[in-house]
């Protein structure tokens, strides 16, 4: 019958201990568990091997300082039990240096006797120093690399026990790749600025809807190349009307005006393709006299158009300065207004459906001839 205290402090406890091996005998011993006897035997074997190596290794004979410090170290250790062995060695070295030669003589003689005795006992002895310093350095390096302080562990581990990979400073730097140039080079006029430095072109003003616009904006090189290019997105009938009007104006002008370089009519008619190519399909026949005022959704005009306007202004000033007839000046003024370019405060009046550019040129020419032949008072 078992005791009420559950077997603690009674004989039933021993019976319970004995019954456990009997109950577990059928299961057998686990394969991964090692018996306690093997661990104890391993420790005993390692101690025996270390002792045999120490006994088999021949020690070097003591010098005079070692003979003197053998007894002196014991005496200092008894006087200062709290001092570390390194501190005792420092004190022994200072006191040994402080001794005179007469005081060191008996210890030197004793060290010589021990050396002779050692040579007699071990004639084939050769000093083989133990590389303990290198081993200690390696152990210190391994300990410093493997073991971390609690502060470092808390820095590496998060507050909830998870690993924070950002805290590892492994020496890897993020590699930055250069950004690829944008495919739409026409969207960046600053990158193309060095290409146009030789032409001394003005910088076009940017529009707020340049980025949102899907159609590309073409920035071609000089105006001469642009004059040779053919427009692609305007009405063919409108082109025919302008060409016919230009031919009529050229026929009416004298030969000296046609042969001279930089004729205003030929230059403007030849370079009229630049507004067409710039504005594309948005350039309509009805808006010929108003294209110099673009809407909010249109991009800023190209630099070639601004340069063309400045060249025409200077050319008109030269024409006004020269002594020409009123008939020639009036024809050049009419041709510019019909082409949709306003100069010096000219009012832009849209053409009507009845009067085309040819009829307006003919009517204005007849009026000019009439007033030119009229005798002045």
Swiss-Prot record:
Q: What is known of its domains?
A: The 9aaTAD motif is a transactivation domain present in a large number of yeast and animal transcription factors.
Location of this chain's protein in the cell: Nucleus
Indicate the residues that the entry says bind DNA: 58-126
Q: Which GO terms describe its biological process?
A: angiogenesis; cell migration involved in gastrulation; endoderm development; endoderm formation; heart development; hindgut morphogenesis; midgut development; negative regulation of canonical Wnt signaling pathway
Q: Which SMART domains match?
A: HMG
From which domain of life does this come? Answer: Eukaryota
Listed PROSITE patterns? HMG_BOX_2, SOX_C
What organism is this sequence from? Xenopus laevis
Q: Which Gene3D superfamilies match?
A: High mobility group box domain
Bias-annotated ranges (Basic and acidic residues): 42-57
**Region Disordered: which residues?**
1-20, 31-57, 282-321
Task: Name the InterPro entries on file.
Answer: HMG_box_dom, HMG_box_dom_sf, Sox7/17/18_central, Sox_C, SRY-related_HMG-box_TF-like
Gene Ontology MF terms? beta-catenin binding; DNA-binding transcription activator activity, RNA polymerase II-specific; RNA polymerase II cis-regulatory region sequence-specific DNA binding; sequence-specific DNA binding
Briefly describe its induction. Answer: Involved in multiple regulatory feedback loops with other endodermal factors, including the nodal-related factors/Xnrs. Autoinduces.
Q: Report the protein name in the record.
A: Transcription factor Sox-17-alpha-B
Subunit info? Interacts (via C-terminus) with ctnnb1/beta-catenin (via Armadillo repeats); this interaction is required for inhibition of wnt-signaling.
Ranges for domain Sox C-terminal: 262-376
Q: Which UniProt keywords apply?
A: Activator, Developmental protein, DNA-binding, Gastrulation, Nucleus, Transcription, Transcription regulation, Wnt signaling pathway
Functional note: Transcription activator. Binds to the DNA sequence 5'-AACAAT-3'. All of the sox17 proteins are required for embryonic endoderm development and gastrulation movements, and show some redundancy in function. In addition, the sox17 proteins have distinct but overlapping roles in later gut development. Acts downstream of vegt-signaling in endoderm differentiation to induce a range of endodermal genes both directly (including endodermin and dhh/chh) and indirectly. Also represses wnt-responsive genes to inhibit wnt/beta-catenin signaling.
**Required for transcriptional activity and interaction with ctnnb1: where is this region?**
326-331
UniProt tissue specificity? Enriched in the embryonic endoderm. Expressed in the embryonic gut, with strong expression in the posterior gut during tailbud stages. Expressed at a low level in the adult kidney and spleen.
């Amino acid at each position: 019958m078992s005791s009420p205290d559950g077997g603690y402090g009674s004989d039933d406890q021993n019976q319970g201990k004995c019954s456990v091996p009997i109950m577990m005998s059928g299961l057998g011993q686990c394969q991964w568990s090692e018996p306690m006897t093997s661990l104890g035997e391993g420790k005993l074997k390692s101690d025996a091997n270390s002792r045999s190596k120490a006994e088999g290794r021949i020690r070097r004979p003591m010098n005079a300082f070692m003979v003197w410090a053998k007894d002196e170290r014991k005496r200092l250790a008894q006087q200062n039990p709290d001092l570390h062995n390194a501190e005792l060695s420092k004190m022994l070295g200072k006191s040994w240096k402080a001794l005179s030669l007469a005081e060191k003589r008996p210890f030197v003689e004793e060290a010589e006797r021990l050396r002779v005795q050692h040579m007699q006992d071990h004639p084939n002895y050769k000093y083989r120093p133990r590389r303990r310093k290198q081993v200690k350095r390696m152990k210190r390096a391994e300990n410093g690399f493997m073991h971390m302080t609690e502060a470092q562990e808390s820095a590496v581990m998060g507050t909830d026990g998870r690993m924070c990979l950002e805290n590892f400073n492994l020496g890897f730097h993020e590699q930055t790749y250069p950004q690829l140039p944008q495919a739409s080079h026409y969207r960046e006029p600053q990158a193309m600025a060095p290409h146009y430095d030789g032409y001394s072109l003005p910088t076009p003003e940017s529009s707020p809807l340049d980025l949102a616009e899907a159609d590309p904006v073409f920035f071609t090189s000089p105006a001469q190349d642009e004059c040779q290019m053919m427009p692609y997105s305007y009405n063919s009938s409108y082109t025919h009307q302008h060409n016919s009007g230009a031919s009529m104006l050229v026929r009416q002008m004298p030969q000296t005006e046609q042969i001279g370089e930089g004729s205003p009519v030929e230059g403007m008619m030849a370079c009229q393709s630049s507004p067409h190519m710039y504005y594309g399909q948005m350039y309509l026949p009805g808006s010929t006299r108003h294209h110099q005022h673009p809407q909010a959704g249109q991009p800023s005009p190209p630099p070639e158009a601004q340069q063309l306007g400045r060249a025409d202004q200077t050319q008109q000033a030269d024409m006004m300065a020269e002594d020409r007839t009123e008939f020639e000046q009036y024809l050049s003024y009419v041709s510019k207004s019909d082409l949709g370019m306003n100069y010096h405060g000219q009012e832009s009046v849209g053409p009507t459906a009845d009067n085309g550019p040819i009829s307006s040129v003919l009517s204005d020419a007849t009026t000019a001839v009439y007033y030119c032949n009229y005798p002045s008072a």
